[in-house]
């Protein structure tokens, strides 16, 4: 499932994005953010993080540097 989403993002980057002017207000761009989110966090959390990022991409948000959060270790150290 993760590979399907990564394939969709890569298709967008290769065929759709070059036809539009660069307008992303974030670094890394939303598509690069999505790729990294899926690679770091897997399907479900990657999808959630990517959706949150795309919803922030509007003229009223200042944008800027917004990296993918690091994966939290689920183990509790005692």
Swiss-Prot record:
Q: Is Repressor set as a keyword in this record? A: no
Q: Please name the source species.
A: Bacillus mycoides (strain KBAB4)
Q: What task does this protein carry out?
A: Could be involved in insertion of integral membrane proteins into the membrane.
- The name on file for this protein is Putative membrane protein insertion efficiency factor
Q: Does the keyword Amino-acid biosynthesis apply?
A: no
What InterPro entries does the database record attribute to this sequence? Membr_insert_effic_factor_YidD
PANTHER family tied to this protein: MEMBRANE PROTEIN INSERTION EFFICIENCY FACTOR-RELATED (PTHR33383:SF1)
Which Pfam families does UniProt cross-reference here?
YidD
Q: Which keywords annotate this record?
A: Cell membrane, Membrane
Localization, per the record, is: Cell membrane
Recorded family membership: Belongs to the UPF0161 family.
Give the membrane topology. Answer: Peripheral membrane protein
Q: Please give an example of a GO cellular component term from this record.
A: plasma membrane
Give the source's domain of life in one word: Bacteria
